[in-house]
């Protein structure tokens, strides 16, 4: 009996050790961001051996290790090997940081910028390696996109382009959807959605050569409805759906597609105070008199406080987004969706799985708690008139 117990004990000790060691070796070759999985695996080992019989405990644990090993195999990062990538919106913010980050990793970077003679483009030329090329690329102008394609194709020759990262975007003026001008809706769609589609369609022939990656930067606002973001959220929701459809269609070509849905990062997408003043003036100049009377000028002008709120709450550390984009570009089996940023994954899950009434309650409490009331709703006799 003691010999049997001793043999069983050694088996129960040796098998998990070997399996855990194998999985850990595979883990070290992966992206290095999966430590929580290792903790869960160790916990599973203890549960299996303590609750189940040694035989069934080892069987269940072995199956779990096999599944974990298979999963981690897909998370291994491919070598950079000066793979060529295109990044749009490289002038400032996330796109600017991404161009520098990928250049440091050893990629051949094509940085599409709105102004090739602007300070952002000049800084990229000054601080990055000779592998980085700056391209004039206003993604709302098909001529510039086609010209950029010709330059990239000529420089790559037969190499192919490994990844296209559609990052360029605009926020517009965050306020009630009724107050937004149609020009704001059209501008958000032109840059955030149609620009993404135009760049994708133009550069897909180069992606097919390499069987590479298409990475579209969407937003948490494209997956979870939030007040003040009618134009922006709608355009980003279109980007998310476009990415999902392209993921299905491009799989036959060996191209993998990922959608990045960040939340809460301090980029320059919100614009400057001068830009906001111009947008405020445009709204006040073009709103119908009845609408302006109901909302009140003070309500419209108070929306600029949202800019201060964004700047105070957003993170200046882009590293979670940069790591996720790196994973989407280099992982053998990238995820379809990435949600970097504080609360991004949570809010998207709440929007999809909570009853609508409950989600609306939490969204209004969180995103609209400091929002002023329109003028008409502040009138004491408004409800009496409504009834």
Swiss-Prot record:
Positions that bind substrate: 219
Gene Ontology annotations of biological process type: androgen metabolic process; estrogen biosynthetic process; in utero embryonic development; placenta development; response to retinoic acid; steroid metabolic process
Gene (UniProt): HSD17B2
Family: Belongs to the short-chain dehydrogenases/reductases (SDR) family.
Described function: Catalyzes the NAD-dependent oxidation of the highly active 17beta-hydroxysteroids, such as estradiol (E2), testosterone (T), and dihydrotestosterone (DHT), to their less active forms and thus regulates the biological potency of these steroids. Oxidizes estradiol to estrone, testosterone to androstenedione, and dihydrotestosterone to 5alpha-androstan-3,17-dione. Also has 20-alpha-HSD activity.
Segments forming a coiled coil: none
UniProt keywords, alphabetically: Endoplasmic reticulum, Lipid biosynthesis, Lipid metabolism, Membrane, NAD, Oxidoreductase, Signal-anchor, Steroid biosynthesis, Transmembrane, Transmembrane helix
Single GO molecular function: 17-alpha,20-alpha-dihydroxypregn-4-en-3-one dehydrogenase [NAD(P)+] activity
The name this protein goes by in its record: 17-beta-hydroxysteroid dehydrogenase type 2
UniProt key word Cell cycle: no
Binding locations of NAD(+): 82-111
pH-activity profile: Optimum pH is 9 with testosterone and estradiol as substrates and 5.5 with androstenedione and estrone as substrates.
The EC number(s) this enzyme carries: 1.1.1.62, 1.1.1.239
EC class of the enzyme, as a word: oxidoreductase
Membrane topology: Single-pass type II membrane protein
Pfam families tied to this protein: adh_short
Alphabetized CDD domains for the sequence: type2_17beta_HSD-like_SDR_c
Species per Swiss-Prot/TrEMBL record: Homo sapiens
Compartments where located: Endoplasmic reticulum membrane
Annotated tissue distribution: Expressed in placenta.
GO CC field: endoplasmic reticulum membrane; intracellular membrane-bounded organelle
Active-site residues, record numbering mapped to chain: 232
Subunit structure: Homodimer.
Catalytic activity: 17beta-estradiol + NAD(+) = estrone + NADH + H(+); testosterone + NAD(+) = androst-4-ene-3,17-dione + NADH + H(+); 17beta-hydroxy-5alpha-androstan-3-one + NAD(+) = 5alpha-androstan-3,17-dione + NADH + H(+); (20S)-hydroxypregn-4-en-3-one + NAD(+) = progesterone + NADH + H(+)
Transmembrane intervals: 4-24
